[in-house]
Amino acid sequence: MAAPRRFANILRTGIFPPLKRQWLGPAIVALGLAVTTAIVAMAVMASGLIAFPASREDPVGLAGFVHQSFRASARRHSRDIAVPADLDAPWRVQLGAAQFARSCAACHGEPGRGQSPLALSMRPRPQYLPAVLGAFDARSLFWIVRNGAKFTAMPAWPQRDRGDEVWSMVAFLRQMPHMDAVRYAGLASGVEAGTAIVAANPRTPYAVLDANEGPREEFSYTVPAAAFRSGAGDCTACHGEDGAGRADGMAPNLTLQSPTYLAEALGSFASGARPSAIMQQVAVSLTPQDIERLAARYGDRRIAPPGGTVPGDALGARIASEGVPARGVAACSSCHGIEGASPAGFPRLAGQNPIFLAQQMQLFDAGVRGKTVGYDPMAAITHRLTPAERAAVVRHYASLPAGARD
């Protein structure tokens, strides 16, 4: 029995001596070094000795390492995101194109246009998206557009509840690498493809400091280049030249509403009371005089939508005129069909874009649509209607002549 005890004692004291004899000293030294290093690092940072100029090139290999890490992070954090079945719907692509032209092209370029010298003077530089989007799947793109990227000029989506808007941007981004300048111009601005001026101007390189920094295929030092522009009054890209909407688009027909309603809606978008990252960007750039001018320009014109009417729906007509009393749903026409009653609060629905109406129903049902002014029972109403009933109401109102009594 003595031998096993001696062996155990050797294991305990010889090979693995007591903690305070072997590890305590080195642990104290390591802790001291860590604290000292942290203090020195904080002192150096606070002193201003380290400069962060965008005019200097990034260290060799840093940009590639950061981009690879960013792509891996986006894939990891987006793997559980559900992709909508209608991701490639034309109306999504069109809406995304208009928003991209307004908000993103100035930094990332666009089909037919390179990147401006101002954007390419950032560090890190924004990539030329038509050339690099193939590295990202739909889920990764959604995560990036919705969340942005820290320590870059890439913002998060301003309205986090509007995932539907983000998916429209993703729908466009997935198709952009395959677009030429003519198709892009038609989608983004509403200009007929045959009149797209940019298509007649082939891209040519321009000289820029550090143009050889990093992989050139990820950036576009070419003219014509996308420019920073104001979104003030930029209505036609989504709503069409006359405000009645665009064929196959999802933006609403503005001409159905009164100037009062349009002005109040722009105010609600600007304040965030009615969440929409797309509309808020435009609305906050408008002065009160701009809002008054735009409301007067589009309001009460009642122009038929370019896509024509859709077939009516008997169930929708019955709900619009009678409601669903058994579930406490009042007739839609009790608010929306009374001319002159609260023009700021109750929009006209007859002849409205069916895609827009369906989307608004979904937003009300999800509790994220917001409101313009005053009393708003729509969240409760949409909860009490089945999806089939909501779709029927949409078909009914979309089938009516523009501006008719609902």
Per-range role (PLM):
Residues 147:
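Glycine-rich, acidic and aromatic/proline-enriched surface loops and short helix-turn segments
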Residues 359, 363, 370-376, 384-406:
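Long, contiguous C-terminal modules that act as interaction/assembly or targeting platforms
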Residues 4-98, 106, 110, 117-118, ...:
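Periplasmic c-type cytochrome electron-transfer domains
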Residues 123, 257-280, 309, 350-375, ...:
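Extended intrinsically disordered, low-complexity coil regions enriched in Ser, Thr, Gly, Ala
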Residues 266, 280-283, 295, 317-320, ...:
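Generic hydrophobic alpha-helical scaffold/packing signal
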Residues 97, 101-124, 150-153, 179-180, ...:
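Periplasmic/extracellular electron-transfer cofactor-ligation site
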Residues 128-130:
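Soluble periplasmic/extracytoplasmic beta-strand elements of cell-envelope proteins
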Residues 1:
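Acidic, glycine/polar-enriched metal-coordinating patches/loops
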